[in-house]
């Protein structure tokens, strides 16, 4: 056992328990997520049979009405979130023997981190969209304003970002840091984050590489602050503004405020996977990673 400083707190590094706890948590994670997503699907089916929404799980990705698709997907994602939070509460209480808030939920002094995360996601997608327009990779078609769909998507991505960040950064990375140095911990947790998206539609090696890099990007602040609000805000903003600017998100085609035509699917524009499946996204993430590392390193000092 050795000791290290994170911020102003002294933490114990256990070379065995941390990494083992992190890796073994993957199995119950998939069990809980599958079980609770099943509840979400069941509720959506009930609403479908009662004619409240048009939902048939066998044709889930073929739902013609975008509103119904978003309602069903939002329901499923919030059940997913409940499952993740319940699992982590159990693990923190009975395995880690720590308060649940130690995952990184303290809001004290973190408003600026939330603003920074939301702003960076917007800037990343706005600049990426503009560059692709100027390069002739995509062609603007028009706007498709629908406030209810925008609200549903924002709520949906809140659930997605909290669930994924709380598990991957709040639990997996937190435990890995008890066993390994920050670089190794970031690499392992980011590989897990990337592989969680392995079965997404239209995924390819460029997309998985970018998701790995994004995992490091999202984890840098946690290494220095042990707080989740910046990665949650950046993850939320990244997903939300990606679809607002017309891109698919992690291979999923959904409602977009801006509509454009992809001239030709390639690794410059990301094709059917979305902007995060592009070389441009990788470049932006690497640049942002460097500046965030400098920023939070200075913050920690």
Enumerate the predicted regions with their spans:
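Hydrophobic alpha-helical transmembrane segments
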Residues: 68-83, 159-163, 266-286
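Juxtamembrane helix-loop-helix connectors linking adjacent transmembrane helices
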Residues: 42-75, 96-166, 173-178
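Small-polar-interrupted transmembrane alpha-helices in polytopic inner-membrane proteins
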Residues: 125-128, 157-161, 182-198, 212
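Single conserved hydrophobic/aromatic residue that forms the stacking wall/gate
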Residues: 1-12
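Hydrophobic core of alpha-helical transmembrane segments in multi-pass integral membrane proteins
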Residues: 28-34, 81-91, 122-128, 281-296
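Membrane-interface helix/loop boundary segments of multi-pass membrane proteins
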Residues: 163-188, 220-227
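Functionally important transmembrane alpha-helices
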Residues: 35, 207-266
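C-terminal membrane module of polytopic membrane proteins
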Residues: 45, 240-301
């Amino acid at each position: 056992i050795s000791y290290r400083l994170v911020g102003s707190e002294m933490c114990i590094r256990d070379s065995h328990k941390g990494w083992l706890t992190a890796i073994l948590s993957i199995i119950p994670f998939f069990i809980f997520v599958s079980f609770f997503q099943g509840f979400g699907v069941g509720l959506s089916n009930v609403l479908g049979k009662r004619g409240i929404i048009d939902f048939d799980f066998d044709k889930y990705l073929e739902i013609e009405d975008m509103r119904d698709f978003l309602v069903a997907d939002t329901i499923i994602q919030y059940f997913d979130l409940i499952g993740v939070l319940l699992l982590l509460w159990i693990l923190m209480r009975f395995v880690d023997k720590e308060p649940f808030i130690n995952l990184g939920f303290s809001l004290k002094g973190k408003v600026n981190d939330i603003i920074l995360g939301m702003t960076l996601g917007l800037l990343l997608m706005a600049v990426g969209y503009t560059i692709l327009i100027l390069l002739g990779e995509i062609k603007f078609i028009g706007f498709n304003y629908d406030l209810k769909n925008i609200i549903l998507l924002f709520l949906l991505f809140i659930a997605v970002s909290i669930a994924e960040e709380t598990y991957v950064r709040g639990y997996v990375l937190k435990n890995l840091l008890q066993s390994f140095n920050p670089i190794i911990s970031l690499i392992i947790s980011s590989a897990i984050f990337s592989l969680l998206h392995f079965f997404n539609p239209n995924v390819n090696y460029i997309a998985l590489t970018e998701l790995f890099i994004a995992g490091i990007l999202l984890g840098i602040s946690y290494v220095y602050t042990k707080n989740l609000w910046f990665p949650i805000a950046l993850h939320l903003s990244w997903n939300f503004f990606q679809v607002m600017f017309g891109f698919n998100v992690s291979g999923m085609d959904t409602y977009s405020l801006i509509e454009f035509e992809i001239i030709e699917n390639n690794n410059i524009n990301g094709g059917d996977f979305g902007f995060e499946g592009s070389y441009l996204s990788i470049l932006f993430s690497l640049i942002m990673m460097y500046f965030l590392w400098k920023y939070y390193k200075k913050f920690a000092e």
